[in-house]
């Protein structure tokens, strides 16, 4: 269905116990004079939750018209996979991602102009000319989609174009550099000495480095080996030494090929037992290679295939036993925390997919106050650490944290370290529930719609803020 005809209203008897009279009168003022920009201004000044008590916002299932004379213009960029139903599993019957319209509308509500445009691999030059007029681009293309049904080199041509816009001072979210550097597992090595990092983190890009170093780290303590590719716990292995004691200090011992390991893959928590040589062979050459042994994992291994340039890498970190308490996901828009989510595993140690229960917390909550403060202290240094100086933070990204005891041994203190960044076309979960098939944005329940729009509206405000910063305003 099209946009709902709706009005702005206020409760008959506002609950003034939750806010001062000045705040309530200001909220009521915005309610009476509701325009896209003033609603965004109200949220920025009073907070989204406060404004929602007094302002019943419209629901829009279609793209809003951009305000006349908007100072900043943006576009949401999509790609439809040739021959795929709806243009891909992330699209609805109208050919759009379910979250594209709310993201574009978030920009409009914040006072900017925004359109949704498509990238066609056979109309690259036409697209390149069209995007010159925009102040910034919000790219909503899933990783790997540009290699489906397209001519060879499409991804590189698209990335080169995005980088050329960045060189002209135009933000692109998320840029190719941010996706490949911040989104890669070896980002954990680059933040190892920051508050959110784990000091004994190593990256391997070839078989020799993997074999030499892993035998030393594994001889000292339980480890976690993470592949760069894959998702939902695939290729993330918890590793324990089986039938042999760990050495007392790092570097004093190195394992033999015949030493035995207990391994748990995080995608489904299944356990396997292999020799060191079998595990290294699996990581390098796959389960069918000579000397790999017999594997229950249904995935192909070969984690270093293609080398560093192709994303072939493994990261080696200390195993943190408190992962059994679950992971903490921080959902961000630029430098602003939008939500904190505790993912508690239901059986096993993995908090992926349907194996976990979710509890949601608002920014500033007491439970994760120290985590939030620590993250905010690191954010200004984050992109520099990854050789991304001058790039804007992703417009939508997540950081998954694992709890641990204090590094200095202080009893009763919990610290958190990043296990993964995600900044490649992060989906908006409340919209994704109706993703694909014949359902559209109109099929999202009201409660989920308004909750998800808190995020997309924040993205609009943040996008304009980052454009201003890029222009030096």
Segment roles from a protein language model:
Residues 138-140, 224, 315:
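Structural motif
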Residues 234, 238-389, 402-411:
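Phosphate-binding site of ATP-dependent enzymes
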Residues 366-369, 377, 384-395, 403-473:
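C-terminal active-site "lid" helix and adjoining low-complexity regulatory extension at the edge
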